[in-house]
UniProtKB/Swiss-Prot annotation:
Pathway: Protein biosynthesis; polypeptide chain elongation. This is Elongation factor G, mitochondrial. One of its GO terms (cellular component) is mitochondrion. One of its GO terms (biological process) is mitochondrial translational elongation. It comes from the Eukaryota. PROSITE patterns: G_TR_1 (PS00301), G_TR_2 (PS51722). GO terms for molecular function: GTP binding; GTPase activity; translation elongation factor activity. Belongs to the TRAFAC class translation factor GTPase superfamily. Classic translation factor GTPase family. EF-G/EF-2 subfamily. GTP binds at residues 74-81, 145-149, 199-202. Residues 1-39 form a transit peptide. Mitochondrial GTPase that catalyzes the GTP-dependent ribosomal translocation step during translation elongation. During this step, the ribosome changes from the pre-translocational (PRE) to the post-translocational (POST) state as the newly formed A-site-bound peptidyl-tRNA and P-site-bound deacylated tRNA move to the P and E sites, respectively. Catalyzes the coordinated movement of the two tRNA molecules, the mRNA and conformational changes in the ribosome. HAMAP family: EF_G_EF_2_B (MF_00054_B). It comes from Candida glabrata (strain ATCC 2001 / BCRC 20586 / JCM 3761 / NBRC 0622 / NRRL Y-65 / CBS 138) (Yeast). It is found in: Mitochondrion. The gene is MEF1.
Amino acid sequence: MLLVPRVPVVMQGKCGLLKISRPLQGSLSRGFHFSRAHRSEYDEEKVVIDEINKKLTPVDIQNQQKLRNIGISAHIDSGKTTFTERVLYYTKRIKEIHEVRGRDNVGATMDFMDLEREKGITIQSAATYCSWDKDKNSYHFNLIDTPGHIDFTIEVERALRVLDGAVLVVCAVSGVQSQTVTVDRQMRRYNVPRVTFINKMDRMGANPFKAIEQLNSKLKLPAAAVQVPIGAESELKGVVDLLDMKAYYNKGDNGEIIESGPIPEELKSLAEEKRQVLIETLADVDEHMAEIFLEEKEPTIQEMKDAIRRATIARKFTPVLMGSALANTGVQHVLDAIVDYLPNPSEVLNTGLDIAHEEAKVNLIPSVQQPFVGLAFKLEEGKYGQLTYIRVYQGRLKKGSYITNVKTGKKVKVSRLVRMHSNEMEDVDEVGSGEICATFGIDCSSGDTFSDGTLQYSMSSMFVPDAVVSLSITPKSKDSTNFSKALNRFQKEDPTFRVRFDPESKETVISGMGELHLEIYVERMKREYNVECITGKPQVSYRESITIPSEFDYTHKKQSGGAGQYARIIGDLSPVEGGNKSNVFETHVVGGRIPDKYLSACAKGFDEACERGPLIGHKVLNVKMLINDGAIHSVDSNELAFKVATLTAFRDAFLKAQPVIMEPIMIVSVTSPNEFQGNVIGLLNKLQAVIQETDNGHDEFTLRAECSLSTMFGFASSLRASTQGKGEFSLEFSHYAPTAPHVQKELIAEFQKKQKK
């Protein structure tokens, strides 16, 4: 029987009185049973991981324990590239610090593209490795710095797919912003645990505890500080560690020397209060910590560390550290936290699909004794040819060995194997399980799985979001060789960048995640391929759908001497319930009235019809086609006839089903100084945006609203004018919604006018 004290429990410890609040007592009594009755997803994974680890050799275990694959993610301008620069400096990977935007004519190490250094944003994920010494052990980090801008979200997806943990960088002034929410969603999709670093503590208006509240409320992720700052804004001096209750200060020209001392008198009560909050939060998410409470004990430093590690790896909690990368404060503590709280490769469950056995799910074993399995997660065109980044999940990859592309069955030789440091590389002979490396001369696509040829394992590919913006592009010169070469390379590197030729306008059309995304590629074409282009006005990627069911009974006949064409299909079109953004094709034909080979042709016809809708030629969304009857002719029926019949029946039924044009609805997040709040709200009202929430800070505000993408072109210059250049914004796709009736009429009229031309 479980006994819970009915009065507050007070415990005397070296850090003062530790009192459990009444709400916590309730959560402890509930949580003790709750954690057993409702085991988290990770609890189930842990059972499998423990079984896998029994198969590892002592050497495997030792190698894995010293390895961390870490990503650094954040909202744009939260300071993560500056943070990464300090990490490289403190781990002795670079000898001097350079700043973002190339202010010193050098630029941040990880921003190696000229465009990145000019614009001060990270466009591609740069990979590097470094070592960090802690407790007389050397730990090896594979580190990836990812873009914060929403237009480059595929780079974040690629990084998280192959990482075991992440550092989430949050601005102390702005707190949780729109892209922070997006990154959180991506981390959850790939089950990536994270530690959080609240950066820019030296900025005016810095409020780390408000940011922690937002982590709890907006991200619905239990979070608690493991540090409190010593001073803030321009008076930031260091941090207090809430586990060992000591003060730490960064000294030296670049903060490379760390000194410790007693907690300043004025911070003792705050430190004790926040330490208790940390312990209470841990007791809510960790069974062992809950037991310590119920036994009325004060947790030791090691017990707290262990609880933080367990809860973080289980994705139930994130420890929050704080400091300022630009002011060289607090970064080394984050490196310690990566070692202490984030998982090594043997603590993460990675699975594949065994193609040889009907895609049965298989667990990958992070041992060099196992057959090789790796995932190509990123492609780059380098000066020595195509560079392919590979995460090794099982076995080892050796220079000179042969590996097989599981998708194509093609065998290739690993002629050169390198570890990357930004755009520089270091040759290696071999990499083991859990490592990230790169190789040359392998023809593949992003997301392909490689093996040693004995296994046919495939790993699930990265999530690729739909493109929402398109524009026409034409080279100024008639020589189109480099133009085609550039487009082919960019498509291969970036799955969210798409190219198609419009037969009506005779133009090449590129599509992507936003205006900036496409602008960057147009600029890269000019710089890297010497191809200047003329671009058209950005176009919205609309979708077409229906609102009511519609039946069809269509017969396709064609007779022109000799064998003709005959196909009859009967069925209906209907909207897909739930709006899951997919189209569905089903057949319920009985008695063999339509043979399977003809039904397969119907499915191809349906897919083709969905690529180009009847209203304005855009893709079709949320439509289900059911064929339940039909007829064939013994001589004239063939696959082409049934495909054509499906295309025509689809079009006719679609137009009778009260069709609608759907437009992308975006979440716009605007941050600006407080004095421009009225201007920004007025600007959004003109665009008929629906304001969802406003977050007022010390000297700036953040506003989130829903608006149609079609109204947002040119918003950057309007915002600049309304805020004297001090406002910034980001756009993220939310969902598709029907356009206004008058807009639909205009779009259809415009499309029909083009058709006549």
